[in-house]
Structures are given as structure tokens and as C-alpha cells.
Amino acid sequence: MIIGIMGAMPDEVDQLCARLENVTVELYGGVEYHRGTLAGKQVVVCCAGMGKANAAATTQVLITRYGAEKIIFSGIAGNMTSKIGIGDVVIGKTVLYHDAQLDMICQNPPYLKEYAGDPALITAAEKACAEAGVKALTGKIATGDLFVGDSETKAAIEAKCAPDCVEMEGAAVSQIAAKNDVPCVILRAMSDNADEDGHEVLVVKKFSIAEYVATATRIVAAMVEAL
């Protein structure tokens, strides 16, 4: 079994890449694919780049070129719910686009308006979070091609689809995985509250996301070990 592990930014995958053994690296389509073993399992780790197009293209490459049989996307997101806080995790039970006309998208394979996380991968993620002492919520993730960093945009997304967090890649990864019948799950550690404070910290001041990424890295490593 080959497990594909993705992130959108280098910081989101660097810690995982550092854990790999027997590593080979291939540059393909502008993306570095790190093949190796993690907890004795064959994995391919890559930084897809930000946004839906990058995420979709890289997911297909992982499946077609590298034979990924399961996909785990790990990274950070903006919190949209009072049920959790900064540093906590959302596990994607459902993932959808907040910036697309869903009744148009669902006219093509896989004919879905939203995408379900794989039950076995969700269970593995829930167990890994519990064992790591990380508070996790299995819920809804919304994806769009913008960084949500103001209250007005946040409120509009809340009114449209009421997600638990918002990010820029998950639905695209999930759509391509579903199209290929490959099990997939999206994991997100909360780095901000998708408001003005988040924009100031992450965009203006370029604050380090290492502590949030470390949470996601621990969870993914534990999941791979359990699979």
C-alpha cells in the first residue's frame, strides 16, 4: 500500500519529510515528490502549492504516477466554530467548495456537491488525535481560492454553508480522490479564526505556523503507523 501525504505549503510537509527513511526525491510538474518509508509504510509526501488547481493537479499525479492508494491532506485552516479553538483539529467528515456553483460542478464525475472523508481514515485520525491528547472535531470543511481574513467574508461563508473551518485545497483534493475511487481524508489544525486577526498574524506579520504544523504532523505519523 502506498499512502500519499499532501500539504499546501513547505512548512506543512517539511516535518514529515524529515521523518522519512530511504528517501528519493523526484521533481515532476514543478512539485517535489518525496518517496520513502514512514513507520515502515510506503509513502509519497509532497507540497502541492496553495489553491484548488494546484491541489487537484498534484492529487492526480500522486494517484496516476506514484500509485497512491490512500490520500491524507494535512495542514492549517481558519476556525469557523466555537466548538474548538486555535491549535485544535478538524477532521473532514464532509468537504465542499464555498466559492463555486455546486449544481454545475456535480454534473460531472464524481457527480457530487460535497465529498465524504473515508470512514476508515476518519477513524484512524480520531484515534490518533485522542492518543496525542489533541482536541478534534469531525465535521465540515469549506474550500475556496482565497485566504479568509475579514469578518465580512467569514460571515458570508458561514451563511452559505456553515463549515467548521475554511481553507484553500481540501475539496479539490477530495474531488479528484473521489473521481479515482481513492480513499481520502482532510486534516486541518486551526491557526487562526478566519478574521482580521488571522490576516494580521499570518499574512502581514508572516508569523511562524510551526506549532500548528507540528500538531498535524504528529497526527499523520500516528495514522500512517496504524494503517
What label would you give each PLM region?
Residues 2, 26-227:
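Glycine-rich phosphate- or other oxyanion-binding loops that anchor nucleotides, phosphorylated ligands
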Residues 1-20, 42:
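Short, conserved "active-site rim" segments that organize catalytic pockets and cofactor/ligand binding
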